[in-house]
Amino acid sequence: MFSSGVALLTSYMLVLLLLAWPLGIALTRLVDDRLPLWLIRVESHIKFLENSQMKWQTYAAAILVFNLLGAALLFLLMLFQGSLPLNPLHLPDVSPLLAMNTAISFITNTNWQAYAGETTLSPLSQMLGLTVHNFLSAANGIAVAFVLMRALTRTGSQQLGNAWVDIWRITVYLLLPLSVIYALFLAQQGVVQSLMAQISVPGLSGVEQHIPLGPVASQEAIKMLGTNGGGYFNANSAHPFENPTALTNFVQMVSILLIPAALCICFGRVAGDNRVGSALLWTMGIMLSVAALLIMWAESQGHPVLANLAVDQQMSAIQSGGNMEGKETRFGLWASSLFATITTAASCGAVNAMHDSLTPLGGLIPMVLMQLGEVVFGGVGSGWYGMMLFVFLTVFLAGLMIGRTPEYLGKKIEIYEMKMVTIGLLIPPALVLLGTALAVILPQGLVSLQESGAHGFSEMLYAFSSAANNNGSAFAGLNSNTPFMNITLAVLMFVGRFGVMLPVLAIAGALIEKRHQPASAGSLACHGPLFVGMLIGVVLLIGALTFIPALALGPIVEHLTLWQTH
């Protein structure tokens, strides 16, 4: 029956590539400013779309100011939602610390949720606040990816682009059209789209039930396309009003990685060599496939505690088998395992099953995918430029081995670039490890744990890995709505996002000044199986050296203990 999981993974990858290829071609027009003439004429009448080129410092300042202003407005919207319209359930104002945490979460594309959406936020807060920032945070990540692409393929300090123009075009010409089509499809499939607060129906026991509704389809579309992940409902994509059918589940999985995959194809075309984009796509695809198969295998083994209770966990024609705790029967084991892989490989964080109920090894894989820096496809834009940091490190190490100055696409990778690469690669793991250590030492952190021992440590490690790498998913046994967790995780989300984004922009600013050097016999070919293997090795080596000690205290020891005692 494992063949069913392999077939699902294979069909998923084929559909993803078929859809990503034309989208990647379309994205090259946004990178290269090749728009239809009529659009250029329309933009010429919009004052802030004067396409004056920015230096990297100006671009970075624009991104920071834009996001800080957005966070302030979102914070105020939630802080005073009780006095604002479109609040049919008369939900109270959100507490200041939770509002601050949520605002930072959504501007950083993390979408960490320390609240239940249907009982905490009004439709106005969900639509005007969260949904808007789902678009803007995604556009910010893609814009920074565009800047690095231009830096690698152009020469001249005034060729990096304009932040306002990039964000406008990405939002209006890419994200909005795709989201409208996607939302209509979701609504047709049964995803709720209503301004009604709730509907009352008689339950099976005769007691009236109040079922919350809301403008879900419109938020769900960009939630997945923008690798945001924050659900309208607390159950996220496990909720039938967000993800009702096997078809919507498959489409949601494809939509998570659609833009990240398309950016790899786009990069190859912008660089004038499709092979460099394909190398990144192969690297990410191999790592994703291996991770998915590992989770499927781990979950298919079942749970030893349930086995001792004589619970039937065997696969058959009438049940998925394996560890079905925390999973929806309409999706089954294979689709739930693949979704868990995809959502943590990307910085999405949406879930269609409870990750806290995964087996120890099944929960280990999503944790590792986040700890690698969200570079296995990763978030829209951020996954691509995060992987490029590893690419620069790989060519640097290769250059050291053969005694040549490292270069990529004909541009030399020198001391300044490697300093920025080091900063970008070290900040997220440092935040994860220091934050986790602080949380398990201080009583203010320990009060959030409902579990003790290895699993309790795993819950805390997962939370800080998710926040620092802007994923947003969680092991749900952790109570994160405390002053300590709200403040600490907000700091991690902000620094984890901009602590990587700013070094990437600095690298772009340095590379744009350099001229392309012609390739020689000693130049490293940045494509082909050898380069893909080297890149995978560097990514795994950095992750293994950094996190194996922490993982040994959590999921690894939990697995050994669980299977030994049962």
Swiss-Prot record:
Keyword Cell membrane recorded: yes
Annotated compartments: Cell inner membrane
GO molecular function, one term: potassium ion binding
Top-rank lineage group of the source organism: Bacteria
Function: Part of the high-affinity ATP-driven potassium transport (or Kdp) system, which catalyzes the hydrolysis of ATP coupled with the electrogenic transport of potassium into the cytoplasm. This subunit binds the periplasmic potassium ions and delivers the ions to the membrane domain of KdpB through an intramembrane tunnel.
Assembly notes: The system is composed of three essential subunits: KdpA, KdpB and KdpC.
Protein name (database record): Potassium-transporting ATPase potassium-binding subunit
Taxon lineage: Bacteria, Pseudomonadati, Pseudomonadota, Gammaproteobacteria, Aeromonadales
Gene: kdpA
